[in-house]
């Protein structure tokens, strides 16, 4: 590729002498020549490097943590032949987030009541007994105890 030609000093002097033309946004094209067409960009793109965008870089996706893969794994363990719609998956994810928040809030209250700075498995177990009803709480406590035992032994 050939290097760009340098601007002539005479053209620079003309621009300096007439500041009124500089203020006018559009210059008249010389007679006999068509004005150069502006470079058109696809919709949503802006000309130049406005906004600090780097050329050629894609916008990084925000990672959203969900329980969707774990819900799906449990579903396949319980009912291997059944699927789940995206709407139902979203509802299940919201349900798990809600239960998690309730358990965490209850465990935090228990730690505060006992003037302890740390939430331990004991606070979690008590909060499960308080938040979840009857038989569900018993099963959750037994599964939680099993998971903690498995974690500490490995």
Curated annotation (Swiss-Prot):
Reported modifications of this chain: Can be acetylated to form H2BK6ac and H2BK33ac. Monoubiquitinated to form H2BK143ub1; may give a specific tag for epigenetic transcriptional activation.
Keywords: Acetylation, Chromosome, DNA-binding, Isopeptide bond, Nucleosome core, Nucleus, Ubl conjugation
Main localisation: nucleus
Single GO MF descriptor: protein heterodimerization activity
Pfam family, one: Histone
CDD domains attached to this UniProt entry: HFD_H2B
Oligomeric and partner information: The nucleosome is a histone octamer containing two molecules each of H2A, H2B, H3 and H4 assembled in one H3-H4 heterotetramer and two H2A-H2B heterodimers. The octamer wraps approximately 147 bp of DNA.
PROSITE patterns (alphabetical): HISTONE_H2B
Cross-link Glycyl lysine isopeptide (Lys-Gly) (interchain with G-Cter in ubiquitin): residue positions: 150
Organism per entry: Zea mays (Maize)
Residues recorded as bearing N6-acetyllysine in the entry: 7, 39
Keyword Nucleus: yes
Family label: Belongs to the histone H2B family.
Biological role: Core component of nucleosome. Nucleosomes wrap and compact DNA into chromatin, limiting DNA accessibility to the cellular machineries which require DNA as a template. Histones thereby play a central role in transcription regulation, DNA repair, DNA replication and chromosomal stability. DNA accessibility is regulated via a complex set of post-translational modifications of histones, also called histone code, and nucleosome remodeling.
GO cellular component: a single term: nucleosome
Compartments it resides in: Nucleus; Chromosome
Positions of transmembrane segments: none
Biased composition (Basic and acidic residues): 1-25
Stretches the record annotates as Disordered: 1-62
Protein name: Histone H2B.5
